[in-house]
Amino acid sequence: MARVKRGVTSHAKHKKVLKAAKGFYGRRKNTIRTAKAAVDRSKQYAYRDRKVNKRNFRALWIQRINAAVREFGLTYGRFIDGLNKAGIEVDRKVLSDMAIHEPEAFGALVSAAKKALEYLKEAGTANEFEGAVK
């Protein structure tokens, strides 16, 4: 059986790791042992931060919606409650975008939410009202 020399394979693996470590500080970019550890850690950070990014954006959308809704005399929680009771299903990303770029349409949603809240307060029930969009 012929002897298998692994030089080519090792070189390719090392090259792949060092390419991923390009731009790192100090020895982390050119010493294979430290570069491998740094690249592994960077992948862990990237995985974690893809999840954190989603949280951060949702928080940003909520802050924007809250700021826009307060101009109409509502709080974020009451606004979302009103939308749910009115049967309007719009996600927070779209609401945030509407608040910034289409204030008239956003105002219409706020008035629909207010109307639903007032109707249910007058009726004294927590059920959906007749004007709900299905």
UniProtKB/Swiss-Prot annotation:
Pfam short name (any one): Ribosomal_L20
Swiss-Prot/TrEMBL keywords: Ribonucleoprotein, Ribosomal protein, RNA-binding, rRNA-binding
GO MF annotations, alphabetized: rRNA binding; structural constituent of ribosome
GO biological process assignments: ribosomal large subunit assembly; translation
GO cellular component, one term: ribonucleoprotein complex
HAMAP family in the cross-refs: Ribosomal_bL20 (MF_00382)
Family assignment from sequence similarity: Belongs to the bacterial ribosomal protein bL20 family.
Function: Binds directly to 23S ribosomal RNA and is necessary for the in vitro assembly process of the 50S ribosomal subunit. It is not involved in the protein synthesizing functions of that subunit.
Protein known as: Large ribosomal subunit protein bL20
Source organism of this protein record: Rhizobium johnstonii (strain DSM 114642 / LMG 32736 / 3841) (Rhizobium leguminosarum bv. viciae)
Lineage of source species: Bacteria, Pseudomonadati, Pseudomonadota, Alphaproteobacteria, Hyphomicrobiales
